[in-house]
A protein has these predicted regions:
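Alpha/beta catalytic cores of group-transfer enzymes, especially the acyltransferase/condensing modules
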Residues: 1-90, 94-98, 155
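Acyltransferase/transacylase module recognition
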Residues: 66-158
Length: 158
């Protein structure tokens, strides 16, 4: 079993699955002149049907939880858009075994008028994907106190 697990940006996909199947896809990509094929060190076949058991476990766990009305919209990257409150448990349950539509999510945000994105966490990988999707987006990265202060100043126009 192998499937596309992440649609990052134009020209970049991530596949995941059983090790041998992933190796076969890697070989096929290279044979068909893929510009670059990189093996990622992950701890599991995330966002694939191989995580169905984890998805079912989440479903059972969520039956014990109370979900409240969202105060701000959340774009679920399994769908690439917002959802209704009552769908949250089902979407979260499916998220572990469904592909991530990062590019679709960013394009949806742009269609909603978003022109600034702040990446929080180490590195600038997601910002690089956003640049490949739409170079007009203003990007900031926060990974420590210094970059937080710099971003706050920039957003205040200082």
């Amino acid at each position: 079993v192998v499937s596309i697990s992440i649609y990052n940006c134009p020209g970049q996909l991530v596949v995941a699955g059983e090790k041998k199947a992933v190796e076969n896809v890697k070989e096929l990509a290279l044979e068909n002149k893929a510009r670059r094929v990189i093996s990622l060190n992950t701890s599991g076949p995330f966002h694939t049907s191989l995580l169905k058991e984890a998805s079912l476990a989440l479903k059972e766990r969520f039956k014990k939880e109370t979900f409240h009305e969202m105060k701000i919209p959340v774009i679920f990257n399994t769908l690439g858009h917002e959802i209704e409150d009552q769908s949250i448990p089902e979407i979260l349950e499916k998220q572990v075994m469904s592909p991530v539509y990062f590019e679709k999510s960013i394009r949806y945000m742009i269609d909603q008028g978003v022109d600034t994105i702040i990446e929080v966490g180490p590195g600038k990988v997601l910002s690089g994907f956003v640049r490949k999707i739409d170079r007009s987006i203003q990007l900031y990265q926060i990974e420590d106190m210094e970059s937080l202060k710099k971003t706050v100043k920039a957003l205040k126009g200082e």
